[in-house]
């Protein structure tokens, strides 16, 4: 007899919950969604890419917020490099210099290559490093963009309406994740050890019948912003801390 389990993962102010089918007698503490069967290598690669993408989304959401900085750093003509291996060395040296000066800083850093210029550059999200220090420690070119992460991030729902997800930085994380190319080799991103790595809670048995039209109840203080059944056979739900409650709290401080 098959059963359904549900499992939540909290990443900062975002909660993701999946509901999936398991064989009867499966221990909820160790259960996982059944891995799908793939017809082609491309399908498997796409599945693995989505898993990797989701991990970076959770990492960014768990560690960064409006006090954090997003920066883009470029190389000047004197320091320009032409291979991914050279750029990876530059990234690693910069990363080590940042942590030498700010050992408790949280950092996620990627390198990419411009589509039109083919020039390498870095993107970084950081917390605990002063804005003026980023350019000083970089020292190999320009900081062409540096800004704080947004308090409110809007995403289109199934009907095209823009919904406030608050501190859900999925779009930024996906943008960084997409910079990696297979020919680069190595890992898609580098994250400091100080970053929290979110892990899902142990699963529990789903005693009710759920569907995107009848989702699990949101955790207290959260609202449902996404509900769907995936092509891999499990249900996916996303909840965020209600951004309206943030408006109320921020407003009360001003009174």
Feature-to-residue mapping (PLM):
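Right-hand nucleic-acid polymerase module
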Residues: 1-118, 128-255
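Calcium-binding loop positions in Ca2+-binding modules
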Residues: 121
């Amino acid at each position: 007899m098959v059963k359904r389990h549900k499992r939540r993962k909290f990443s900062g102010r975002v909660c993701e919950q999946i509901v999936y089918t398991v064989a009867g007698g499966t221990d909820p503490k160790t259960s996982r969604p059944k891995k799908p069967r793939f017809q082609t290598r491309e399908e498997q690669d796409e599945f693995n890419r989505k898993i990797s993408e989701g991990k970076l989304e959770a990492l960014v959401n768990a560690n960064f917020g409006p006090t954090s900085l997003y920066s883009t750093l470029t190389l000047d003509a004197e320091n320009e490099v032409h291979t991914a291996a050279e750029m990876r060395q530059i990234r690693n040296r910069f990363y080590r210099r940042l942590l030498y000066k700010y050992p408790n800083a949280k950092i996620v850093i990627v390198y990419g290559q411009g589509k039109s210029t083919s020039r390498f550059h870095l993107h970084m999200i950081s917390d605990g490093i002063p804005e003026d220090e980023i350019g000083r420690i970089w020292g190999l070119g320009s900081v062409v963009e540096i800004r704080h992460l947004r308090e409110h991030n809007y995403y289109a729902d199934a009907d095209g309406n823009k919904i406030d997800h608050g501190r859900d930085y999925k779009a930024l994380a996906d943008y960084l994740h997409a910079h990696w190319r297979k020919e680069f080799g190595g890992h898609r991103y580098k994250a400091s050890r100080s970053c929290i790595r979110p892990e899902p809670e142990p699963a529990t048995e789903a005693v009710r019948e759920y569907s995107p039209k009848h989702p699990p109840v949101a955790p207290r203080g959260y609202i449902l912003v996404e509900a769907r059944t995936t092509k891999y056979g499990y249900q996916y739900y996303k909840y965020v801390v209600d951004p309206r409650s943030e408006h109320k709290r921020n407003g009360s401080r001003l009174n």
